Amino acid sequence: MIPSELEPEFLHIPVLSQAVIQGLNLRPGGHYLDATVGGGGHSRLILEAAPESQVTALDRDQQALQAARSALQPYGERVQFYQSNFADYESGSLRFDGILADLGVSSAQLDQPQRGFSFRADAPLDMRMDQRQSLTAAELVNTASAEELADIFYYYGEERFARRIARRIVQHRPLYTTAQLASLVSRALPSRSQSIHPATRVFQALRIAVNRELESLEQFLERSPHWLVTGGRLAVISFHSLEDRRVKHGLRDHSLLQVLTKKPILPSSEEISANPRARSAKLRLAQRLDALEG
């Protein structure tokens, strides 16, 4: 898909696309909620696969929403757009035949250096998905205590050397750029061969903390089943164990849901070859029970 000319970098290659379409059990004329529309890739698939269907498209990222508006313009009034964190969305009287959430940071966000999500290019330490919020990664790094930073790195990044990194940050701050932080983290860790960049877990942890991703996910998993019609499907794609654990338990423990996937659906080797960022994707599905059954 080619997004808007204004946002050419917001390319959205939908992961697990066929599994999502089959899992949502699409029907002509159905109404679907894309809770994380991104560049519009999954929404386009839904609109193409289900004639006369409608999509309500959410994203907290204004740039993503602009790209989705452009990409989905041919579908006209079949799509309605709202800038919102999926945890805060109010469905009102609307009930959906299916809901999709594609979690975490998008490839487009990682590929926009000025957003500060990636350590691969120097940029301000921002990491806000919603530019309307005030808290940035720089503010968190420069104001949190060593104990608070260590907890963030350990619980949100599963970083073994969380305390060591946190102490080093406090000793050398203020830090304002991604390059400064990545360099400091690399120097703080013992030299050893690693399969990932030394700063990977720290950047993930800060992004999750700045955007309250896990708290938002838990709220979404609790609230979204109430937005489904009886028999409606909820599909959630996660990309790391912290997300997947919450999705697994959230679907299993909700009184209104019946889990449809004992184990998560994974991308094929062909999809991973075509889109390497799909390699860690996991799809879980559940179906809304009748209110009396729940």
Swiss-Prot record:
Example GO biological process: rRNA base methylation
Q: Which domain of life is it from?
A: Bacteria
Record GO cellular component, one term: cytoplasm
Q: What is its main location?
A: cytoplasm
SUPFAM superfamilies noted in UniProt: Putative methyltransferase TM0872, insert domain (SSF81799), S-adenosyl-L-methionine-dependent methyltransferases (SSF53335)
Localization, per the record, is: Cytoplasm
This protein's UniProt keywords: Cytoplasm, Methyltransferase, rRNA processing, S-adenosyl-L-methionine, Transferase
Key word Methyltransferase present:
yes
Query: Any idea which positions bind S-adenosyl-L-methionine?
Result: 40-42, 59, 86, 102, 109
Q: Which InterPro entries match?
A: RsmH, SAM-dep_MeTrfase_MraW_recog, SAM-dependent_MTases_sf
What's the Enzyme Commission number for this chain? 2.1.1.199
Describe the reaction catalysed, as an equation.
cytidine(1402) in 16S rRNA + S-adenosyl-L-methionine = N(4)-methylcytidine(1402) in 16S rRNA + S-adenosyl-L-homocysteine + H(+)
Instruction: Give an example GO molecular function.
Output: rRNA (cytosine-N4-)-methyltransferase activity
Broad enzyme group: transferase
Summarizing the function annotation, the protein's role is: Specifically methylates the N4 position of cytidine in position 1402 (C1402) of 16S rRNA.
As for family, the record states:
Belongs to the methyltransferase superfamily. RsmH family.
Name recorded for this polypeptide: Ribosomal RNA small subunit methyltransferase H
Per the UniProt record, the source organism is Cyanothece sp. (strain PCC 7425 / ATCC 29141)
Instruction: State the organism's lineage.
Output: Bacteria, Bacillati, Cyanobacteriota, Cyanophyceae, Gomontiellales
Tell me the gene name. rsmH
